[in-house]
């Protein structure tokens, strides 16, 4: 048996950052430390007024560009007719005489105006700050009524789909492992975890995920990463266990290689 110890950490940790500036108009009841949310759920909302006005302005400019294009198409058609009255082939007409550059400019203005509308729409959407995944808030930096600038961290969150435990293994520990443990065959290997939850001793079952394949300089150890799924809503073999909270310190053990010519002896009383 190989034993080690480690701390439960989230697999995914995120700083939620505002991409727009403005005053926070509302926050979710779940926007508190420990608040649990689902992917896509609204966490907070920045005042959208300036961005609504910007979108309206962009849409108005687009309508103006569309009107200008209609006008330019009519002038271009009239220029072609006037050229045809001369009796000369249309292929001999200068581009300026047919207003081709003006028509191209009007079409380009349409594309630019559409891009500005899309940009304004995206900015408006970003006033609604939603959860990127199912998770929990571990730190909040702002609250309702506060002005925030673009790039300001609003909160720190972590995902609750998986947690990981990094287990340091010394050379002595590694010598107890089988050759297959250093290959992809390691993945999914059962790892027993023991720790405290709600003041009581608890146990969980995890699965080996990967070796980090780097020797830590401080302790000359390699790290085995163990994964536990749905730690805050345990299922399967862990369905009767207490939630495995981020930050919990656990002791882990798993079966190593079988040693030949070794027998278990009963301890004398």
Located regions from the model:
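Low-complexity, intrinsically disordered
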Residues: 160, 179-205, 215-216
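Extended amphipathic alpha-helical segments
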Residues: 2-3, 60, 64-68, 72, ...
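Surface-exposed patches in structured soluble domains
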Residues: 36-42, 123, 130-176, 207-209, ...
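Amphipathic alpha-helical coiled-coil segments and their boundaries
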Residues: 44, 51, 58, 85, ...
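Short coil-to-beta-strand transition motifs
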Residues: 1-3, 18, 130-131, 194-205, ...
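Structural microfeature recognizing short secondary-structure transition sites
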Residues: 200-263, 267-268
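Long, amphipathic coiled-coil "stalk"/hairpin helices in large membrane-associated assemblies
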Residues: 2-61, 132, 136-144, 150-152, ...
